[in-house]
Amino acid sequence: MLANLFGKNGLNGSTASLSDSDSGSSSQYNSKPSSQYGSPTSINFKDDTSSILRPISGNILDHMSDDLKSKLFATKDLISDISLAYYDPKSTNSNINISPDSFRLLLTEETGQMVCRNNYRVVLDYVTPKGSYIEQIRPSELKEYIFGSPVRSSDSLEVDKIRVIPNSNILIISRTFHVSSKINRLAICLCLPSYYLPVVMEAWRQVSTWLDNTQASIISIISRLKKPPSTLHLQCDKELSCLLPADARFQFVSEFESIILALQRKIVPCLRSISEIPRLFLYPTTLMKFVELWFKDVFNWMELKDGPRMNFLSTLLAIIIVNFKEELKSSESTRIAIMSGNMVVSNKLINIISGILEPKYKGPLLHTDEDNELSTKLEQLDSIDTVNTSSTEIHMIKKTNSNSSISVSPASTKYQNSNKGWEIPRRRSAHSVASISSGESLAEVIQPSSLKSGSNSLHQLYASLSNNYGTSYGSWFNKRPNISQFMQYSSPSNSNESWDRAASIHRTNSGNSIQQLRAGFGITPQQSPSISEYDEYPWFGTPNSPHVENSATATTSNTTVSSASVPWTTKSITEPNRMYNVHIERDFQRISQTELLDDAFDKICKPGRKLECGLTVTPGNMIHAGVLEIEILNQDCVEKSSELLPRYTSYLRNYNSWFKLQAFPANNESESKVITSMKKDLSVYSYSKALLISLSTRDIKEVTIKKEYKNNTQDTNSFKLIQKTARMFHNGKPQANLSLELNNCILLIESTLKRASELLKPIQSSADTSTAMTQEARQEELLKLFKSIIYFKDTKT
């Protein structure tokens, strides 16, 4: 076997590489043995220290509008604990120049002496990438953290330790164990960047499983090397009864390779994913603003994606409520995967789905004053227009010696000022513009020469199509509008002068961009869709375009264009359809509860503050000091939200098996990736379940995989996997084999949505208020309707 691994020459200067299909990387083994025990191991995987990976979620948030960020994450300023300084290879501070993929693995063993300064030796020391800061810590220092006191311990208990080395930003995870006898202790030590500390316990099942497998491999190696008792006794003086030889890493290359590959391809990616991917915030059901927006998002989806006859969304919500809601909350092997080529549409569906999932946040929400924020924004807008008009103008019309600007009608009561998402870039010397499609991460489009005009700032706009309204059209739209369809809405008297730059509207692989024409409505631009996303993206000016609901007015110096006369839907900026008045202090994984702790402490200990709960004082005695017992099981402390958010996330560029709700690009291997991860779950769990949603084909599948043991035994080597796939929605209609409970839930959702649409009509239109319900009664009934949906299984008889 060794000859096959290292070639015909065995260990004499030859190398061998093994590839893995999952990562596409190769591993090499250097045959030259180490001269001392403390040096790194001979196993040397290919490391490219120059290509340090960027944060996983970097582009996800950059391409997301402020409105969508507020709905998904309850904040616009989502900040990770992992600073970008960690990823800067040019950083001079060695304490922070640690790649997120860096780790160090040590396998150490005691030498059998009771009291000795060097009563251990290093059997394996593997570091990646080479030359990182983790490698600079001496093994003798790590030994102090692993074994502790130099006095040998006769305790045979298995001990797991987690600690951070002071002033080093390095986290140590170690396991100390004995084999069969109490001769020597062995230790597995894993060194990681310290910013993984908050997520280690969340991923402890995966880490503990890797430690168990590593320990089993070491015990297997020792059992294969075990000598007869007489031979072991004769070598005690020379070998000091060591269980592992010094060259064990050369004798058992495949075993040590599997240990390192499992660490490199499972544990480190798991920790990195959990720490770097932002998680959704589940709004409480008591927040009326969220309930209204949730219903509006549902109606937008059903009108623009499902159509009048397709009940795709109601069926999907019913399946999640009946079959997945409780399991997602309690099981780590249940997931919902949305496969789509469009990031914006997928995130809007995730926003709808997250509204019915648990566990919801039960703590207090920090609100900002809407009126003050509105007045501040309007004052800022007025001051910008008066002080520096040229900085806010968007030249839609080319006119000599004239600054034609677009202004928002003063009748507006709200103005969305976005500073995230796609923004107008700064003026550059090169007038080419990069248009990024949702299917292409960095696709630069060479613009025509007509854009290279310094007198017009139109070339500064990104070619994009805003999907900020929660609208998205289905595949039944037959054609995309051309430029002539937009030119017909301009004034005839100004056609020669006002639209002479119409040819300079950006052209991308998705067709003509109309974002320039909508720039005056305060909408955050989004990326333009590619040709492959045509069936999932809204195209305006088509026969089935929805009616215009509002009449926001855009005014130029020569003509006034009303939103009622343009071929696209323009929601008035007066409509309260934003979550900007809610802000949560949080990072990527958890909610900050500092204010809750401070408030609880003030209630108990602040002088002069009335205590709202009972207390009991136990006087001190010779045994203990005085004790103050406080009854905290009151209304303020019951059912508080946990700090850690569930592993639900938004659209990702690649499928991530450690998140239970996500969307990712659709391709030929999308379903196989999910099923493969489900099978891997069965190494820890006995049951795995997934809901596969394809937006391009409008298919919903429920896949379950479970273990079935042979002969009714729990032997891990005598079981088979049973996979069942149920098609729940296909060809635009639910399947006939749905359960009675599912059908009842679908009917409930449809009737509830019908009633909710009637309640929301007075809010969306200027109907007669004499017969309309009061605002309080309407909100109360909307809240009851929403709770009847999400608590269907709890209230059904």
Curated annotation (Swiss-Prot):
Stretches for region Disordered: 16-43
Keywords attached to this Swiss-Prot or TrEMBL record, sorted alphabetically, are: Amino-acid transport, Protein transport, Transport
Q: Could you tell me where the Low complexity compositional bias lies?
A: 16-35
Q: What molecular function terms (GO) are annotated for this protein?
A: GTPase activator activity
User: InterPro entries, per this entry?
Assistant: DENN_FNIP1/2 (IPR037545), LST4_longin (IPR041153)
Q: Which residues form the cDENN FNIP1/2-type domain?
A: 293-683
Decide whether keyword Endoplasmic reticulum is in the record. Answer: no
Q: Cellular component per GO?
A: FNIP-folliculin RagC/D GAP; vacuolar membrane
Q: Say if the entry is tagged with keyword Transport.
A: yes
* UniProt record, GO biological process: amino acid transport; cellular response to amino acid stimulus; positive regulation of TORC1 signaling; protein transport
Residues in dDENN FNIP1/2-type domain copies = 690-767
Q: Which residues form the uDENN FNIP1/2-type domain?
A: 98-285
Role: Involved in extracellular amino acid uptake. Required for the protein trafficking from the Golgi to the plasma membrane.
| Membership in a protein family | Belongs to the LST4 family.
Q: What is this protein called?
A: Protein LST4
Record the organism: Vanderwaltozyma polyspora (strain ATCC 22028 / DSM 70294 / BCRC 21397 / CBS 2163 / NBRC 10782 / NRRL Y-8283 / UCD 57-17) (Kluyveromyces polysporus)
Give the gene name: LST4
